[in-house]
Amino acid sequence: MNQYILAIDQGTTSSRAILFNQKGEIVHMAQKEFTQYFPQPGWVEHNANEIWGSVLAVIASVLSEAQVKPEQVAAIGITNQRETTVVWEKDTGNPIYNAIVWQSRQTAGICDELKAKGYDPLFREKTGLLIDAYFSGTKVKWILDHVEGARERAERGELLFGTIDTWLIWKLSGGRAHVTDYSNASRTLMFNIHTLEWDDELLDILGVPKAMLPEVRPSSEVYAKTAPYHFFGVEVPIAGAAGDQQAALFGQACFTEGMAKNTYGTGCFMLMNTGEKAVASKHGLLTTIAWGIDGKVEYALEGSIFVAGSAIQWLRDGLRMIKTAADSEAYAEKVESTDGVYVVPAFVGLGTPYWDSEVRGAVFGLTRGTTKEHFIRATLESLAYQTKDVLAAMEADSGISLTTLRVDGGAVKNNFLMQFQSDLLAVPVERPVVNETTALGAAYLAGLAVGYWNSRDDIAAQWQLERRFEPKMDDDKRTMLYDGWKKAVRAAMAFK
């Protein structure tokens, strides 16, 4: 009987279950969306029980549709939307409040208070992160502040905190394992990435009792087995976990220092492996843990771009310039250039390296001769310019010059964008055969832990190139275009 690895990819808008075989190929996939709650402007919440239900549903679907028996699953790997925060009762397993999602800004006030007290350098030094509503720590504080009696119950050990990986492992194991992995812990604002422990000083500042925190474990090891009543009567090892962007770095086989990947989803996330060094950023990047395996931790630099694929959705749904996202490529290729037009898609502010949440979207360089094609091309090009901003920061911080960029995510199907990205960065861009690199990374982490794959070398050998884009632009043109982008960003930031 063939054995498979089951990856659970729990995302922001949907949960997916993907079966992989020993060659790292997708056997079958199932997906289910769930409800987004917006109780107030800027707030985003999920129902943690609904997420759990969606995960059970996709597991059942993928096994039945692929005609794979539960006992053919060698191990389960979990990857997840990072930072999203759940607090639940230890005895009943019931959440005491909705999950507060990574995008949610409801703790911005708490962050402002912490920054006003001068805590930013302390948090940055210990966690590699900025004080921002994006990360879990202030979300836990918010729940403990707003749910009556919660902090006292947490101190008594009656409540548990977890990011989504922790919640799913706890549920799948029937409450036998309250654990997280190093990569997810490093996104909480409560974990010291140098000592590799929950940090008492930071917990005191946030008012979060240590008793509610999960045990931090390697990203590739058996945490527990599935409770038979949740997995069709079978106990399967839950053997790997990593946050979605770190899992994608692993799935792209970026195992050596200086290798990098960029994921083009709703936003863009670029990670560079910095090996066993936690590189402190002077250019607006986050220092984060890539994964912990075989008794050692490896680090990464991360750049976050808030608007990428969502800019193409805006062309389709907001401006109705295109019928499908794929149409953007054909329109962009009808013109030789944008004719001097720049789109700065700062719909929710700008991320790395600017970290300006007040700036809004802007368009520059319009003339009477500007057409729809120019506008669409300029919007696509903005994804590549933002990526160049991030890469410039990475190279400055790490002292490493990138030799190739591996890419994944929905927008990488756009050949125009990938070619322009290569031209602008002056490095080759490599698109893999398997684009589901996040789930693949989780599968690899779980499979390594149970001997389904033997080593990272085996995994690196499986990585297959679908297409390589080589830079074709001359240096003068590249410099001229990028100077124009920087001018456009400065102008957008001045208009507030």
Swiss-Prot record:
Superkingdom of the source species: Bacteria
Processing after translation: The phosphoenolpyruvate-dependent sugar phosphotransferase system (PTS), including enzyme I, and histidine-containing protein (HPr) are required for the phosphorylation, which leads to the activation of the enzyme.
UniProt-listed Enzyme Commission number(s): 2.7.1.30
Pathways involved: Polyol metabolism; glycerol degradation via glycerol kinase pathway; sn-glycerol 3-phosphate from glycerol: step 1/1
Residues binding glycerol, per UniProt: R82, E83, Y134, D244, Q245
Binding site for sn-glycerol 3-phosphate: T12, R82, E83, Y134, D244
Gene Ontology molecular function, alphabetical: ATP binding; glycerol kinase activity
Family named by the database record: Belongs to the FGGY kinase family.
Quaternary structure and interacting proteins, as annotated: Homotetramer and homodimer (in equilibrium).
Name of the protein in its database record: Glycerol kinase
Origin species: Geobacillus kaustophilus (strain HTA426)
